[in-house]
Every structure is written in structure tokens, then in C-alpha cells.
Swiss-Prot record:
The keyword Cytoplasm applies. This is Elongation factor G. GO terms for cellular component: cytoplasm. Belongs to the GTP-binding elongation factor family. EF-G/EF-2 subfamily. One of its GO terms (biological process) is ribosome disassembly. It comes from Streptomyces ramocissimus. Catalyzes the GTP-dependent ribosomal translocation step during translation elongation. During this step, the ribosome changes from the pre-translocational (PRE) to the post-translocational (POST) state as the newly formed A-site-bound peptidyl-tRNA and P-site-bound deacylated tRNA move to the P and E sites, respectively. Catalyzes the coordinated movement of the two tRNA molecules, the mRNA and conformational changes in the ribosome. The keyword Translocase does not apply. It holds the Pfam family EFG_III. PANTHER family: RIBOSOME-RELEASING FACTOR 2, MITOCHONDRIAL, TRANSLATION ELONGATION FACTOR G-RELATED. Gene3D superfamilies: 3.30.230.10, 3.30.70.240, Elongation Factor G (Translational Gtpase), domain 3, Translation factors. One of its GO terms (molecular function) is translation elongation factor activity. It is found in: Cytoplasm.
Length: 341
């Protein structure tokens, strides 16, 4: 057990409440787990980790780096639950996501230093979201396909509405009565709706904050199947979402800038120019602290800009705060770019 200092570590025999220490050799322990005495077991409440708000594409520079990159990503993801990775189905690229530009820069640097991986990294991409602003009371969709032999048939009637709580991204409610849709097909409708939410209808970004209610439907004893109802659920959701006033959401970052008072005007003006909202200003240890909410898309390159405007005398920190609706003129540009227009 070690107490960590800036340039050294100190071995200690025991730790008390509130101590922060490093423990060596825990090969079976992962982030979020609780360690306790076997005789007095205790489990602390699990931590909630936010979803990534920024993504970059990463690819190995050579075939030799391919395997090392996979190992590095796996190890880093085990350590840091806020770091996520997936493959883009259309391009085949590996996409890594994190909580900010600096977060991903540090992870890529660790890949190079600790795992000897040389990789090409793309430009950061903001993880936008889509949601709806209006309820749609009834949308009916029938999936019907007839080829030689057994066909496909499923009819669903759904309603969708926005979820006001920001903590819930999706809900599914079943209100079918009288066996109009057999119980074994209900989860397929749910799965179809969730699949459709992965790619929103405005610009293909994941959707959030939607409640789907299955109202009614119909089936065929021979031609109906789980696949048919999944397709019907997916298509019904897409049709309903188009009618529900879809909007684009962007991640907002809580930004805190510490600056000498002489540069307060420059700092505030710069935040305002980035579509930011000043939340508070206070004094701390002889310096001024400016707190605000700024769209993540406007924070790229902020380190250099802040250094330039304050002669290197200001510093800042930021963390994800929430998602907010993108202004119409900005949303139109984002949607056009996503569609390649």
C-alpha cells in the first residue's frame, strides 16, 4: 500500500477513512469494485459513469501495431469505464470515445508510451444526440412480405412521447390486450424500436429521451415471427419519430476558468463568442474564477486560445454537464454535414 506524492511514493501499513492510496498487484480488481475484510464484508454503491461526449477514429500505422492496439484498448477500457470503443459498421474504423479532447489525448499518449503502439488518430467528433419534442398518439405499420413458401407478417400500432426526466434515455410500455400481439413477439417490437434509436432520423445520431408505447397490432399464425415484429417495430418507430418534431442535442461542458482580474473581460468575451453562458463569477486565492456552460463543439483548441488571450496566466478545467438543444441555424449545418451535403 502506497501514499502517492508528486515525485515519490511512500509505503504505509494501514489506511483510514478518507485516505487516498495506491495498491499494487490487484490483478483481479476492476474500477468500481469494493475491497473489504472477509470477516466484515461491505459493498459500496456502484458508480454511474457518463457516456462519452467526444469520439475519434484510430487505426494502427502498421500490421505490427494492429494486435498491440487491440490489447492496449482493452486494457485501458478495463481501467477507465468512461473510455469506450466500438467499430463503425459503414467504414470499419475503430472509434474511441471519452469525456473530452484532453482525455483522449492522454489515452492515445499512454498507448504510445506504455504499449508501444503507433497509431493514426482522426479529428475529434462531437457525440451529438437526437430526441423528440412532441408526442405522436398513433402510428400504424404493417410489415408484409410474401415470397415462395412462408412469408412475413406483423402489424404494430405505437405511440411515442418525450421523456421529461433527463436521467432516462428510453422506456417501452406494453398496452396490448386480448392477445392481439402474442406475448413472445412483444420483446421483438421493443428490440426493433431500440435498434432504430441507434441511428436518428435527422443526422444518424443516437436518440435519447423517448417513451414508446405498443398499443395494438395483429399477427398471422403462419407468417408472423420475431424478425417480422422487430422490423415492424423499427419502421413504426422511424415513422413516428419523423412526426414528433425531432431535434438535435449537443453536450454542454461546465467550464471553470481561473484568471487574473486584468484578463476577466477577455475571458468572458471569449466564452460568450463560443455560445457559452456565464453561470457565476467569484474570487479565489487572489484570482478571479469564471464559471460557465459551453457547447463542447466550441471548445476545440481552447487551450491555445486561452493562453494567447491571457499571456499564459489563466488556466481552466471542464467536465460534462448535460445535453441541450442545438440552435436551429447551427443544427442545420451539422445535419447537412452529416448527410454529406
Amino acid at each position: 500500500i502506497y501514499r502517492m506524492h508528486a515525485n515519490k511514493r511512500e509505503e504505509i501499513e494501514s489506511v483510514g477513512a478518507g485516505d487516498i492510496v495506491a495498491v499494487m498487484g490487484l490483478k483481479q480488481t476492476t474500477t468500481g469494485e469494493t475491497l473489504s475484510d472477509e470477516k466484515s464484508p461491505v459493498i459500496l454503491e456502484s458508480m454511474d459513469f457518463p457516456a462519452p461526449v467526444i469520439q475519434v477514429a484510430i487505426e494502427p500505422k502498421s500490421k505490427g501495431d494492429q494486435e498491440k492496439l487491440g490489447v492496449a484498448i482493452q486494457r485501458l477500457a478495463e481501467e477507465d469505464p468512461s473510455f469506450q470503443v466500438h467499430s463503425d459498421e459503414e467504414t470499419g474504423q475503430t472509434i474511441i470515445g471519452g469525456m473530452g479532447e484532453l482525455h483522449l489525448e492522454v489515452l492515445v499518449d499512454r498507448m504510445r508510451r506504455e504499449f508501444k503502439v503507433e497509431a493514426n488518430v482522426g479529428k475529434p467528433q462531437v457525440a451529438y444526440r437526437e430526441t423528440i419534442r412532441q408526442a405522436v398518439e398513433k402510428v400504424e405499420y404493417t410489415h408484409k412480405k410474401q415470397t415462395g413458401g412462408t412469408g412475413q407478417f406483423a402489424r404494430v400500432i405505437i405511440a411515442i412521447e418525450p421523456i421529461e426526466s433527463g436521467d432516462t434515455s428510453y422506456e417501452f410500455v406494453n398496452k396490448v390486450t386480448g392477445g392481439r400481439v402474442p406475448k413472445e413477439y412483444i420483446p421483438s417490437v421493443d428490440a426493433g424500436a431500440q435498434e432504430a434509436m441507434q441511428f436518428g432520423i435527422l443526422a444518424g445520431y443516437e436518440m435519447t429521451g423517448v417513451r414508446v408505447t405498443l398499443l395494438d397490432g395483429a399477427y398471422h399464425e403462419v407468417d408472423s415471427s420475431e424478425l417480422a415484429f422487430k422490423i415492424a417495430g423499427s419502421q413504426a418507430f422511424k415513422e413516428a419519430a419523423r412526426k414528433a418534431k425531432p431535434v438535435l442535442l449537443e453536450p454542454m461542458m461546465a467550464v471553470e476558468v481561473t484568471t487574473p482580474e486584468d484578463y476577466m473581460g477577455e475571458v468572458i468575451g471569449d466564452i460568450n463568442s463560443r455560445r457559452g453562458q456565464i453561470q457565476a463569477m467569484e474570487e479565489r486565492a487572489g484570482a478571479r474564477v469564471v464559471k460557465g456552460l459551453v457547447p463542447l463543439s466550441e471548445m476545440f483548441g481552447y487551450v491555445g486560445d486561452l493562453r494567447s488571450k491571457t499571456s499564459g496566466r489563466a488556466s481552466y478545467s471542464m467536465q460534462f454537464d448535460s445535453y441541450a438543444e442545438v440552435p436551429r441555424n447551427v443544427a442545420e449545418e451539422i445535419i447537412a454535414k452529416a448527410k454529406g451535403e
